[in-house]
Amino acid sequence: MAKQANSLAHTKWMCKYHIVFTPKYRRKIIYNQYRESIRDIIKQLCAYKGVEILEGHLMEDHVHMLVSIPPKYSVSSFMGYLKGKSSLMIFDKHANLKYKFGNRHFWSEGYYVSTVGVNEATIRKYIQEQEKNDILQDKLSVKEYEDPFKGQG
């Protein structure tokens, strides 16, 4: 993708961020119908604010997004909006989740953010391959529960 600056009335801008955030208690809840619903809600809220999702991936227990946020919004105000509104919309659509989370707080406090410059391709690849890497790490971590002193036979 060619690097193109976006435009507002008197501004040319190219503000890209890699953002990661998690459900409350880092619960592994983003799957099946929840995954599809959360994806649609996040897309809808981003479109409403004029935030372009360049790359994104929903894992069971966290969300990776590469986004382009207009400079009229701070990252913190956008994330407050995204997490706050999406929580309300998720609980409206899936009322049974209130028993797992309570208080209509779906997301944990805070988030990770980094700016994206020349390493955009690297970050895109990282987001795309995140699930594969997590699966490989899970397979490696299974061995730690095996007793090394027991024989094979």
Question: Where would I find each of the regions flagged by the language model?
Answer:
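Basic nucleic-acid-binding interfaces
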Residues: 1-153
